[in-house]
Amino acid sequence: AKAQRLKTLTEDVVEASKVSSGNINLQLMDVNLVEMMNQTTGEFAEKFEHKNLELIQTLPNEPAIIHVDGRRMWRVLENLYNNAAKYAMPGTRIYADLRTDKDEVIFSLKNVSEYPLNFSADELTERFIRGDISRSTEGSGLGLSIAKSLVQMQGGKLELYLDGDLFKATVRFRKADKKEQDSCFFRENSEE
C-alpha cells in the first residue's frame, strides 16, 4: 500500500510539474463527455460503494462533444471523482450533472464534505494545501490543482464553490463545432 501511495505521489508531482511548465503536448480530438462520464462512473463504483456513497448522475439525451485531449480530460474527471470519493461524507449522495446549452458543455460534481471546508476555493487549487484534518487521507494534495491546469490548457474553465460543507466543481468547455461532431468516444480529428 505504501509503495502504491508513493507511486501515485510521484506521478502527481511529475504531472503537476509538466502542467505548470506547459510541457505537455495535447492530442486534441472530439470526445463525447456523456460516454466518458459513464466510463468514469463505472471505474469509481467500487470506491463510492465502499464509503456508502450514492451517485446521482444526470446526463443529456444527446452526445456532449468537446474538442480536447481525451487522456487529459479523463485525468480531470478522475481527479474530480477521486476527490469526491475521498472527502465526501459517508452515506451521502454525490451529484454528477452534465448539460449542454447553445455553445457550451457544462459538467458539475457536488458533494457534502466529511470535513469542514474552512478555507477558500482558491486555496483548494493551490498545490499541497489541504485542511489539517484531511492529512490522514491518501493523496498528494495536487489533484484539484492538476485538474484546473489541465482544463485551462484545453481551453476550458474549472470553478470551485464552497458553501458550508457543500463542495461543487464546475467544468465548462465550448461545444465542438457541428461539422466535427460524431458520437465516437475518442476520434482523432483528421485536420491535425
Locations of the language-model features?
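A conserved beta-strand-to-alpha-helix junction within the catalytic ATP-binding
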Residues: 27-42
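Short helix-loop "hinge" at the ATP-lid/N-box region of the Bergerat-fold HATPase_c
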Residues: 84-85
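Conserved glycine-rich
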Residues: 155-156
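Conserved micro-motifs of the catalytic ATP-binding
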Residues: 21-26, 65-68
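Conserved catalytic submotifs in the C-terminal HATPase_c
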Residues: 27-30, 49, 54-64
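Short alpha-helical segment of the dimerization/phosphotransfer core of two-component systems
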Residues: 1-6
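Short conserved segment of the HATPase_c
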Residues: 116-129, 185-186
